[in-house]
Amino acid sequence: AWVACETDFVSSNDIFQKFAESVVNHVAHAAPADVDELMGQTFHDGDKTLEVMLKETIAEIGEKSEVAGFARFEAPEGGSVEIYQHFNKQIAAMVAISDAGKADTGYDVAMHVSNLKPEYLTRDEVPADVVDHEKQVQLNRAIEEGKPEHIAEKVVEGRMGKFYEEIVLMEQKFLKDDSKSIKQLLEENGIGVSQMARFAVGENNEDDGEGEDE
């Protein structure tokens, strides 16, 4: 869960961190669909809604705070959810992997996600309109460079590979060893990734601020 505040001082405050942990525990137990539903739910181990608990936390710490987002994964049978959190707690990522025995590889992939910021898990997940737009951009670029249309189309194919490498996890070069892609890394270890999520303070909503990624 991503619980945001305004200053570093509050982000390390025990009261704020306790509330952030409560949000994480509640999301795990109650499986809300979105933040609005989450805030209206009664805390799984109490009698107050998360909205009331947030207001009480704000009153205690004296600083605006909010639950900015969350992701909830259920590990596949025999698998696990691996989490990487940057030391400053402002960037975090999580992935669901198919083999709990390969947790180290899952952690490495989560760290990769936090740094390389893939938008999609596989090439098939990229929306058709996004692909079509990029193809047109690259075709126009190739033609402007003076390439004949039949050559330009081949150039576009090559450039689309680079495009996918930037935004698709499976296509990206592994952060710790760029001689292989994430897809190759997973194949070598005999595991799959079914879900991923990344949170970064100042990137996931309109308001910049400090925060606690739990």
Task: Please annotate each region the language model reported.
Residues 1-214:
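N-terminal assembly/interaction segments in proteins that build large macromolecular machines
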